[in-house]
Amino acid sequence: DGSSVYESSLKSLIDEYLRTHENVDANRVYIGGCSNGGYMTVKLVMDYPEMFAASFPICEAYKTNLISDEEVVKLASVPTWFVHCVNDPVVDINTTAIDLYERMKEAGAENLHFSLYDSIVDPDYGNTYNGHFAWVYSLKNLCTTDYDGSNVTVDGNQVNLYQWLATNSK
């Protein structure tokens, strides 16, 4: 139904951390997560867009039919980089990430990226993983391409997901 019993607790945790850690730059708060963590990433950005400098939902599970056009506009205001795999057996990419990406684009998102993979293969050992494990590529700093297959660049330089995150601030 688009709600979460965890949202207020997670928001309170972030608020408390920022309040008690003065050395944290509140203009550079990033949020990301995998699967249900990706759901919570979308949920928190949708409800508190002013809090986050950028987001990176990975194999996010938020059904887009539960997201209003007004909420999409809020999401589009925050730089976002989606990561997902076409053969994800857990989350239907067509009713979550792809649809949300397209709706955010239509809503005018200017700093929007999407690394989409056909399968998840460990680059070091060649093992093939469940398609839901898209975080393998993000954790190995391998998310560098956009939805159309082009390289993501900042100021003419190719960047990975984490380098891109560091370029964003409120």
Where do the protein language model's features map onto the residues?
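Gly/Ser-rich "nucleophile elbow"/oxyanion-hole loop immediately N-terminal to the catalytic nucleophile
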Residues: G2-S35, M51
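Short alpha-helix in the alpha/beta-hydrolase fold that links the catalytic acid
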Residues: D92-M104
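C-terminal catalytic histidine-bearing segment of alpha/beta-hydrolase fold enzymes
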Residues: V83, P89, K105-K170
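Acidic-and-aromatic substrate-binding clefts and catalytic sites of carbohydrate-active enzymes
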Residues: G2-E7, A61-I67, P89-V91
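Short glycine-enriched nucleophile-adjacent loop
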Residues: G38-P49
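Short, proline-enriched alpha-helix->beta-strand connector loops that line the catalytic pocket
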Residues: K74-T80
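Alpha/beta-hydrolase-fold catalytic nucleophile elbow
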Residues: G32, I58-C59, V83, Y117
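A conserved short beta-strand
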Residues: E50-K63
